[in-house]
């Protein structure tokens, strides 16, 4: 035990920790040391670096992302977006046409373009209705009337993470289109991380905006066919 060095009373706990078999009853002093080490480990939290929107843009300018990379910034983390399937693409394109019809000069339909919603957040909703196209900058929450997320494989993430961030940013209305259950969820009344009101629409229903006047269409017109044509 001389390898521990120091006086006898100093090296005893060290040697006991190293030599006591895992499945034996540990002496009280070892239990106390182990307990103290466990407390320290619990108190040392793993800290992640959160990129700002400015840093995120500089990464893009530096060529870290290619033009084909589909990424967005959520809570300071660069998140790779899932590939777009035919149902997702069909629904987004159809919604674009349906939302554009009543738009005229009232708002602008933005398709899969970024919004800056916080210092650490730049998501790319599938669609967004903007009051206008801001010059010289990306749209911010004050420019947005509503956002739309079309979900198939990303339902949980879109609902629990992205909609929560839209609510925190104060975006008045957010739609979640669940392609698997063929439903529209219209969320309104943003609060701290959650929308206070939710209205659901399915096949046979007429989808209506909670905040944008005269914005309505039949759900059947926006939901993809059961099987691809051809």
Residue ranges and their predicted role:
Residues 5-6, 230:
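Residue-identity detector for glycine
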Residues 2, 12-13:
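Secreted/extracellular small peptides and ectodomain modules produced from precursors
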Residues 1-2, 118:
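Short N-terminal alpha-helical targeting/association segments
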Residues 2-3, 19:
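Serine residues within intrinsically disordered or low-complexity segments
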Residues 13-230:
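Gly/Pro/Ser/Thr-rich low-complexity, intrinsically disordered segments predominantly at protein N-termini
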């Amino acid at each position: 035990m001389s390898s521990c060095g120091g006086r006898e009373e100093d090296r005893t706990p060290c040697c006991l920790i190293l030599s006591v078999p895992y499945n034996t009853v540990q002496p009280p002093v070892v239990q106390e040391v182990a307990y103290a080490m466990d407390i320290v480990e619990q108190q040392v939290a793993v800290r992640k670096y959160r990129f700002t929107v400015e840093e995120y843009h500089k990464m893009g300018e530096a060529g870290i992302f290619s033009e084909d990379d589909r990424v967005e910034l959520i809570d300071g983390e660069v998140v790779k977006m899932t590939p777009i399937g035919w149902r997702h693409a069909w629904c987004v394109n159809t919604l674009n046409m349906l939302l554009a019809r009543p738009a005229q000069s009232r708002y602008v339909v933005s398709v899969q373009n970024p919004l800056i919603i916080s210092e650490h957040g730049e998501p790319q909703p599938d669609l967004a209705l903007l009051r206008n196209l801001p010059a010289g900058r990306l749209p911010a929450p004050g420019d947005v009337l509503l956002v739309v997320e079309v979900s198939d494989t990303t339902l949980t993430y879109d609902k629990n993470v992205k909609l929560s961030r839209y609510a925190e940013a104060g975006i008045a209305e957010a739609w979640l289109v669940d392609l698997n259950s063929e439903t529209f969820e219209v969320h309104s009344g943003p609060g701290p991380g959650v929308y206070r009101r939710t209205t659901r629409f399915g096949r046979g229903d007429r989808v209506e905006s909670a905040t944008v006047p005269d914005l309505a269409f039949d759900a059947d017109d926006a939901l993809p066919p059961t099987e691809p044509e051809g």
